[in-house]
Amino acid sequence: MARITVEDCLKHIPNRFELALAATYRARQLVQGHTPKVEAKDKPTVVALREIASGQVGIEMLKKVPT
């Protein structure tokens, strides 16, 4: 299992606060049943960070209203 670091995610979302919000919103989506865009062996928060680090999810998460 490869480790995910904040630095990997900050390459795609440079603001730490926006990164935390985007990861939170995406993790909530995953819990609600949305399909993960990367391999989903881990908890939803880790999967969300992996998606951000791979560039498949980004700042656009902040423009969506969480439900």
UniProtKB/Swiss-Prot annotation:
SMART domains, alphabetically?
Answer: RNA_pol_Rpb6
Q: Which reaction does it catalyse?
A: RNA(n) + a ribonucleoside 5'-triphosphate = RNA(n+1) + diphosphate
Q: Name one GO biological process term.
A: DNA-templated transcription
**Any keyword Transcription?**
yes
State a single Gene Ontology molecular function. Answer: DNA binding
InterPro entries for this protein:
DNA-dir_RNA_pol_omega (IPR003716), Pol_omega/Rpo6/RPB6 (IPR006110), RPB6/omega-like_sf (IPR036161)
Q: Does the keyword Hydrolase apply?
A: no
Cellular component aspect of the GO annotation: DNA-directed RNA polymerase complex
EC number of this enzyme: 2.7.7.6
Described purpose of this protein according to its UniProt entry: Promotes RNA polymerase assembly. Latches the N- and C-terminal regions of the beta' subunit thereby facilitating its interaction with the beta and alpha subunits.
Assembly information from the UniProt record: The RNAP catalytic core consists of 2 alpha, 1 beta, 1 beta' and 1 omega subunit. When a sigma factor is associated with the core the holoenzyme is formed, which can initiate transcription.
Similarity section: Belongs to the RNA polymerase subunit omega family.
What is this protein's name?
Answer: DNA-directed RNA polymerase subunit omega
Gene name on record? rpoZ
